[in-house]
Amino acid sequence: MNDLTVVFAGTPEFGLPCLDALIQSRHHLKAVYTQPDRPAGRGRKLQESPVKEWAINHQIPVYQPLNFKNQEAVDELSALKPDVMVVIAYGLILPKAVLEIPRLGCINVHASLLPRWRGASPIQHAILHGDAESGVTIMQMDVGLDTGPMLCKATCPVTSSDTAGSLHDKLAKMSVKPLLDVLEALASNSAQFELQNNELATYAGKINKEEARINWHQSAVEIDRKIRAFNPWPVAYTLAGELMLRIHQAKATDIMSTEMPGMVLNVDKNGMLVATNDNALLVEKIQFPGAKVISVRDWLNSGKTQLHTGLMLQ
């Protein structure tokens, strides 16, 4: 079996475990593609992506085209003569001309069990919709949105305490073995492809900040899922008077309530109990504007009184 010349394309932290594995494998990681540096933070200073930082630390050449609409960027990739391109959360659309450059094509590590949750936010949508399991799919890329033939899947349970952050970390780590297995299969010309059933496809649209506001007229379970799906970003919130109150952790209870959804039923060391469309939700960790995340217990001990029984959260 021949060693493969690999080009990697990715931007956020999700791809780092696979990069660590690639550089220790028998294959040759020739270059890394990542999105251009972006302004970030209060100072709006240019910030390198986690993938770029990794590549610099490992002395791997980095390429950061704005897109692949110009021929120069396409020619630059072609000159690397990759056998395969591994794409993980790159964030740029790859046109047909790019997909055809690697001898064995471009393969994508996608954070869902395709064809369920094609699109930009599969992890958040798995939690939002109460999926019992999630996983990663290694697929051959085509010009569609996560529509290509599948090479490998790995599954894991989604627990009742999983947040988008914890599920992200689990899937990032578990993607390593299936990726290496697929590379070995490609190198030995033994890869097997399974077409996706488009009739089973669901789409995970991009999550935005406007969706983060809690609707207390939903059920306690639905609100709990939203809080977990929107942690660590953009973080679900409600209005306590005129203050934005971010909710980082909560759980649905079996306590029935006939009060108006959004009414605070009780605040004690266990948390803040809030009425919903059915059972009450126990809010455990909160964050006021300009303050740190704090448990309701610690907030109570600080002597503050903005949250109290009878308060209507909006």
From Swiss-Prot:
EC number: 2.1.2.9
Superkingdom in the source lineage: Bacteria
Pfam families per UniProt: Formyl_trans_C, Formyl_trans_N
Residues engaged in binding (6S)-5,6,7,8-tetrahydrofolate: 112-115
InterPro entries cross-referenced by the UniProt entry: Fmt (IPR005794), Formyl_trans_C (IPR005793), Formyl_transf_N (IPR002376), Formyl_transf_N_sf (IPR036477), Formyl_transferase-like_C_sf (IPR011034), GART_AS (IPR001555), Met-tRNA-FMT_C (IPR044135), Met-tRNA-FMT_N (IPR041711)
A Gene Ontology cellular-component term: cytosol
GO molecular function: methionyl-tRNA formyltransferase activity
Catalysed conversion reaction: L-methionyl-tRNA(fMet) + (6R)-10-formyltetrahydrofolate = N-formyl-L-methionyl-tRNA(fMet) + (6S)-5,6,7,8-tetrahydrofolate + H(+)
UniProtKB keywords: Protein biosynthesis, Transferase
Homology family: Belongs to the Fmt family.
Its job: Attaches a formyl group to the free amino group of methionyl-tRNA(fMet). The formyl group appears to play a dual role in the initiator identity of N-formylmethionyl-tRNA by promoting its recognition by IF2 and preventing the misappropriation of this tRNA by the elongation apparatus.
Alphabetized NCBIfam families for the sequence: fmt (TIGR00460)
Protein name (database record): Methionyl-tRNA formyltransferase
Organism from which the protein derives: Legionella pneumophila (strain Paris)
Gene that this sequence comes from: fmt
